[in-house]
């Protein structure tokens, strides 16, 4: 709740409407957390505070479209509004500070599903970015693209931590451990891009908030990469068949061989010869 926006405007409407209906109409106070990441929900709150009766569950999305049009023009406003809506829906499930490898389960396909949702949303956001007028790039990164990429990355990182814990073979264990390390590094690169490159560093230090390494509600002093296990055993690629038909590429032998591999010969990966 400190690092990125995790507020759904639908929730803002529901709570403010309760206030209004129960007679709290003179003064509304909101703890914004941090102004910069919360620009859109703050805008919604202020607009609703000005005219509470103008908002209802069926026209909230229209407000998001209007906001997107004001920032990026009419052409892509509806698509951007839908991306913003889905971002806040996904982000609201759990704050990035409290996300960890045990947040979602594998038994109900939860982890792969939520990671896939974030991956698809990032692709949508990138496609729109490429269509925009360059004068809107900075604003789009601040309001739309960076939050999605940052959340997608942290979700994939903790998913990789979970896969590392679940893995049994040395190859899988080390693959997922390396994946965690790369994603942890990418988190710092994304934040550095926001701080130093977007708008020529106008918002330097805005993304310095610690968001990885929480063990309880209070924030740690510094970022700490999630723990992973590693294997020192010699690792080999294992080919598993699930359809009853067993085959491997000619060059994927493991031992007891005197063959020479010829890359790219044949229909698939390679061929072998005894010469």
Please provide the spans of the model-predicted regions.
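The substrate-binding groove and active-site-proximal loops of carbohydrate-active enzymes
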Residues: 1-10, 50-54, 69-73, 105-112
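Catalytic-core regions of glycoside hydrolase
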Residues: 1-52, 157, 200
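Aromatic-lined carbohydrate-binding surfaces of glycoside hydrolases
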Residues: 3, 32-48, 92-111, 258-274
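Generic recognition of flexible, low-complexity loop/linker segments
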Residues: 14-18, 143-146, 235-237
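Short, flexible loop/turn elements at secondary-structure junctions
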Residues: 33-36, 71, 88, 252
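Acidic, His- and aromatic-enriched active-site or binding-groove loops in soluble protein domains
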Residues: 47-63
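C-terminal non-catalytic alpha-helical accessory regions
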Residues: 60-214
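Extracytoplasmic
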Residues: 216-275
């Amino acid at each position: 709740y400190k690092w990125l926006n995790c507020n759904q405007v639908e929730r803002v409407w529901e709570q403010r409407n309760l206030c209004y209906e129960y007679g709290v109409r003179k003064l509304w106070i909101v703890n914004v957390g941090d102004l910069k990441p919360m620009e859109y929900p703050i805008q919604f709150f202020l607009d609703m505070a000005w005219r509470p009766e103008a908002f209802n569950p069926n026209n909230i999305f229209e407000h998001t479209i209007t906001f997107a049009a004001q920032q990026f023009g009419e052409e892509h406003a509806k698509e951007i509004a839908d991306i913003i809506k889905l971002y806040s829906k996904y982000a609201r499930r759990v704050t990035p500070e409290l996300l960890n490898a045990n947040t979602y389960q594998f038994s109900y396909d939860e982890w792969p599903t939520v990671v896939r949702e974030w991956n698809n949303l990032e692709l949508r956001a990138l496609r729109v970015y490429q269509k925009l007028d360059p004068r809107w790039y900075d604003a789009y990164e601040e309001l739309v693209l960076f939050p999605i990429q940052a959340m997608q990355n942290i979700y994939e990182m903790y998913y990789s931590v979970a896969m590392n814990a679940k893995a049994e073979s040395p190859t899988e264990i080390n693959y997922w451990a390396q994946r965690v390390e790369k994603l942890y590094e990418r988190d710092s690169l994304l934040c550095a891009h926001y701080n130093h490159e977007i708008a020529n560093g106008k918002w330097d230090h805005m993304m310095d908030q610690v968001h990885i390494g929480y063990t309880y509600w209070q924030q740690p002093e510094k970022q700490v990469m999630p723990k992973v296990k590693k294997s020192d055993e010699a690792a080999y690629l294992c080919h598993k068949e699930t359809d009853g038909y067993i085959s491997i590429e000619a060059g994927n032998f493991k031992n007891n061989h005197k063959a020479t591999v010829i890359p790219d010969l044949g229909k698939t990966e390679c061929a072998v010869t005894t010469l």
